[in-house]
Amino acid sequence: MLIPSKLSRPVRLDHTVVRERLLAKLSGANNFRLALVTSPAGYGKTTLVSQWAAGKNELGWFSLDEGDNQQERFASYLIAALQQATGGHCSTSEVMVQKRQYVSLTSLFAQLFIELAEWHRPLYLVIDDYHLITNPVIHDAMRFFLRHQPENLTLVVLSRNLPQLGIANLRVRDQLLEIGSQQLAFNHQEAKQFFDRRLSSPIEAAESSRMCDDVAGWATALQLIALSARQNNNSAHQSARRLAGINASHLSDYLVDEVLDNVDVSTRHFLLKSAILRSMNDALIVRVTGEENGQMRLEEIERQGLFLQRMDDTGEWFSYHPLFGSFLRQRCQWELATELPDIHRAAAESWMAQGFPSEAIHHALAAGDAHMLRDILLNHAWGLFNHSELALLEESLKALPWESLLENPRLVLLQAWLMQSQHRYSEVNTLLARAEQEIQGMMDGTLHAEFNALRAQVAINDGNPDEAERLAKLALDELPIAWFYSRIVATSVHGEVLHCKGDLSRSLSLMQQTEQMSRHHDVWHYALWSLLQQSEILFAQGFLQAAWETQEKAFQLIKEQHLEQLPMHEFLMRIRAQLLWAWARLDEAEASARSGIDVLSAFQPQQQLQCLALLVQCSLARGDLDNARTQLNRLENLLGNGQYHSDWISNADKVRVIYWQMTGDKKSAANWLRHTPKPEFANNHFLQGQWRNIARAQILLGEFESAEIVLEELNENARSLRLMSDLNRNLLLLNQLYWQAGRKNDAQRVLLDALQLANRTGFISHFVIEGEAMAQQLRQLIQLNTLPELEQHRAQRILREINQHHRHKFAHFDEGFVERLLNHPDVPELIRTSPLTQREWQVLGLIYSGYSNEQIAGELAVAATTIKTHIRNLYQKLGVAHRQDAVQHAQRLLKMMGYGV
């Protein structure tokens, strides 16, 4: 819960002086990105800005305290303030902060600005007491905020010092409105108005001016003069002389003498006790001070001018002026030292009663009461964990003695989950093992099962599937149905293990169970994870359309639950890109991979490896080797500067080996093959992929026997485990092996199998990537006219893709190529004596690429009759009678020129 008073603009009091000259300056704030009001304590920053804010409906106010250095807390209040200002316009951002579903403050602000782009009226956000922020991450995020905020949004910052917000840059660009302590200091006219409203007897203007000069226009000093004069019947000028030259750091003695020593004992104790509260209401005051009517007492203190200010229009919430509150808290530590722990306990109990466990923890820590802290955590820790109050939880658990954790082992479990969330896997197991060893008496079976569920998650994250499976099964055997979170974890881990072991049907079933349980209990990150796993399994089984539909469910879940900034969103964009690539929708695949990289913009560059590999893959499918090389340079740099899971390395190696194949780089392939470890098994699609990389490198190096042994074993495993997509890929690679080894019949046999299987998988680009060798075989199959209708259609589609993306390498007879050909010593005499025109060379290239007459006419934008004339002429010049003869003639010319066709 958010404390309402922190989001309420201070109430304007009747007796305050209206600072017309400063309000006039602030009236132009909407023309600036930042309005900055800075001065030491007590110069009236908050009062001035609250006067300016009066009547502005589209304004959010956020009053900071020390606890707002926690990023999650800062974000929650900032978004809530803007929600108040816009009447709930930023609903997506609000859900994201409530569920902590954002990667960083900057990514959250980026989402916020997307929503605010549709808000066209002037908008203001006031952040008070910014000097309390010491977290550099928040400073960085607010600099990002200022750089990218919409033009119609003005940020108003109140601070005792110059904040680290890139002020100089804003000043140079004339995007900064500044008001400092010299401008905030009262002038003679304002001082006269102030005393006239505060003192029962008016004073002369000259005396008022002298007092203003004595204290250099410091508003707090003027207030103290008026307070002292009322309390002691002293002359105001006498108080002014004493305050002359004083500053905030030396104010304590004065406040003791002139304020605390001049109130009755009851009021003094009230001030000291209530000062421990950062904000207060009736219930808190009654519990902390023992007063019977807290609201009445607060209003009385306010009337006495004792630096108490209302924080909302209802008058329910109050706080002390920061300068006076700090002074009172210091005096409380000195004067009420023995009572202070009890006062903090009372505050904690009252905050708990009002439903604010975070504030209660703050006071329990201050009280040093481990028992109270333990009780609060036992009742509220998991709620705080689910809302990502991780820093507060970590501080709280560290404050508890180890013996207390052992007596309440669920707190040990919480501490272990905290470590797991921070990827401190080895520490998790150490902590749980120590706890199990030292817990007195028999350990509860359910708790032991919860320990095992967490251990299972750690084991699978750490790449130990056998141990993960053992622990997940133990957990599921012992966990009651009501312990839903741990059951979700254990079921998910078991399903993931089966996925790794190639037991796809059982894995799919468990992941569907995980999804159902997670949706039922609103555990959205596990619901999303289960959908991603289901999609990968369906893809591996060859059911790409079903995988697509599962991905659609995942996209919908992300949208509904605002999960866009979770790293799993990148996973979804990546597997969508893989699917689009398989279907030769290359532009969409590339866009999806780039979107995945955008999701990871706040993470280390190494996290982008998989999406970067997909960008290389798109370039390779297009035959764009220059672009592929540029992207490969980035990919290989990342590979050399990080530690990666084996399947990440396999995907990166795949595009490297294909690139070497397409460029004939046998040296790189041989070097890679020497240093690449060979997996022990091939029982899932990750391991199949790496073995396929090895076989492709072996084929490139002419090691056909070794490659055939690998591929035959891969096919055997793929058939037994129903890894149909892998089988489709393996058949295509086996086809290339047979083709290059001169085993044309075997090559045709496995190509026919691959085409038939592609009716299920929908594969296109996996064929295209094999280039001209694949094109030649498909041309022959099409010309034989023996393919079934579906396979015939797919073969034609694949051939069109190869022609589109790879023709420039193999069959595009451009002017440069023709010139080199005619100068070649072995060029046929017929071509030398009766050369083709440039257009006829183009037509020959398109015939060789498998184009029909109509397609050639469309490609060259001429009439079909014109194409027939060109074909008749080139047949005559080449001395051929049929289309197949022309294809063979073009092939001989390409071979003569050194093309490996």
UniProtKB/Swiss-Prot annotation:
One matching Pfam family: TPR_MalT
Summary of activators and inhibitors of this protein: Activated by ATP and maltotriose, which are both required for DNA binding.
One Gene Ontology term from the biological process aspect of the record: positive regulation of carbohydrate metabolic process
Residue intervals of the HTH luxR-type domain: 829-894
Positions with a binding annotation for ATP: S39, P40, A41, G42, Y43, G44, K45, T46
SMART domains, alphabetized: HTH_LUXR
Keywords carried by this UniProt record: Activator, ATP-binding, Carbohydrate metabolism, DNA-binding, Nucleotide-binding, Transcription, Transcription regulation
DNA-binding region positions on the chain: 853-872
Superkingdom to which the source organism belongs: Bacteria
InterPro entries on file: P-loop_NTPase, Sig_transdc_resp-reg_C-effctor, TPR-like_helical_dom_sf, TPR_MalT, Tscrpt_reg_HTH_MalT, Tscrpt_reg_LuxR_C, WH-like_DNA-bd_sf
GO molecular function, one term: ATP binding
Family membership: Belongs to the MalT family.
Function field: Positively regulates the transcription of the maltose regulon whose gene products are responsible for uptake and catabolism of malto-oligosaccharides. Specifically binds to the promoter region of its target genes, recognizing a short DNA motif called the MalT box.
Quaternary structure and interacting proteins, as annotated: Monomer in solution. Oligomerizes to an active state in the presence of the positive effectors ATP and maltotriose.
Name of the protein: HTH-type transcriptional regulator MalT
Species the sequence originates in: Citrobacter koseri (strain ATCC BAA-895 / CDC 4225-83 / SGSC4696)
